[in-house]
Amino acid sequence: MKVRASVKKLCRNCKIIRRDGIVRVICSAEPRHKQRQG
């Protein structure tokens, strides 16, 4: 899980979602693409 000021999709399988006011990226194909804004 990377924590970044600006989260971006890194591949076409990445999805941007918002949970409890926190923007996250989840990726089914590449778990290393997981990110959280903060």
Swiss-Prot record:
GO terms for molecular function: structural constituent of ribosome. NCBIfam families: rpmJ_bact (TIGR01022). Belongs to the bacterial ribosomal protein bL36 family. Keywords: Ribonucleoprotein, Ribosomal protein. PANTHER family: 50S RIBOSOMAL PROTEIN L36, CHLOROPLASTIC, LARGE RIBOSOMAL SUBUNIT PROTEIN BL36C. One of its GO terms (biological process) is translation. Disulfide bonds: none annotated. PROSITE patterns: RIBOSOMAL_L36. This is Large ribosomal subunit protein bL36A. HAMAP family: Ribosomal_bL36. It comes from the Bacteria. The lineage of its organism: Bacteria, Pseudomonadati, Pseudomonadota, Gammaproteobacteria, Pseudomonadales. GO terms for cellular component: cytoplasm; ribonucleoprotein complex; ribosome. It holds the Pfam family Ribosomal_L36. It comes from Pseudomonas aeruginosa (strain ATCC 15692 / DSM 22644 / CIP 104116 / JCM 14847 / LMG 12228 / 1C / PRS 101 / PAO1).
